[in-house]
Design a protein with these regions (language model features):
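A short, glycine-centered helix-capping/turn motif at helix boundaries
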Residues: 1-7, 27, 110-112, 123
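Alpha-helix N-cap/helix-start motif at helix boundaries, enriched for small hydrophobics
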Residues: 3-8, 35, 117
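Short, flexible helix/strand-to-coil boundary loops that buttress conserved ligand/catalytic motifs
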Residues: 9, 17, 24, 47, ...
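Short, polar N-cap/turn motifs at the start of nucleic acid-interacting alpha helices
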Residues: 12-15, 73, 91-93, 112-133, ...
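C-terminal catalytic core of Y-nucleophile DNA break-rejoin enzymes
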Residues: 25-45, 58-80
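Short, basic (Lys/Arg/His-rich) helix/loop patches that form interaction surfaces
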Residues: 33, 78-119
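DNA/chromatin major-groove-contacting recognition/catalytic segments
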Residues: 33-34, 38, 135-152
């Protein structure tokens, strides 16, 4: 969630367990989110750059605003996401929320249990995850019809 990303602090990164601590996310709940090695590498590069240019306070916001005492706003994060997508050659309108949907869909296509996806997305109800994760067409093609298993 974009608001959760905006509120991340440097100290929320647990690189030894490859987790991000999300404090007071939606529903005012704390949770852990997975941290991919690729993302960790990118965040380390960002941290070195930000620290070298005095953009970040020790233990401060992972994505500080113009005043490092404040986090970067969600509008600025949205613009950064759109800019990165254009730089990557994506011609579709992509938002942080679109990336969240894609994350869930790719996990489903990779046959990750929906309850694990529920936890990763921070949903309290499985029904929310089921709505969120669009039915993956790749999975639909792999479903064997019960008619095909009958010995007629």
């Amino acid at each position: 969630r974009i608001g959760e990303v905006a509120m991340l602090k440097v100290t929320d990164i647990d690189s030894s367990r490859m987790l991000l601590r999300v404090e007071q996310g939606k529903g005012k709940k704390d949770r852990m989110a997975m941290l991919s090695p690729m993302l960790l590498s990118t965040l380390r590069q960002w941290y070195k750059h930000a620290k070298a240019h005095h953009l970040m306070l020790p233990g401060g916001w992972l994505f500080p605003g113009q005043n490092p005492l404040n986090p970067l706003g969600t509008r600025q994060l949205s613009r950064a996401c759109q800019s990165a997508c254009l730089d990557a050659g994506l011609n579709k309108k992509v938002s942080m929320h679109t990336l969240r949907h894609s994350f869930a869909t790719h996990l489903l296509e990779d046959k990750v249990d929906i309850r694990i996806i529920q936890t990763l997305l921070g949903h309290s109800k499985l029904e929310t995850t089921a709505l969120y994760a669009q039915v993956a067409s790749k999975l639909l093609r792999e479903v064997v019809s019960p008619l095909d298993t009958l010995a007629l």
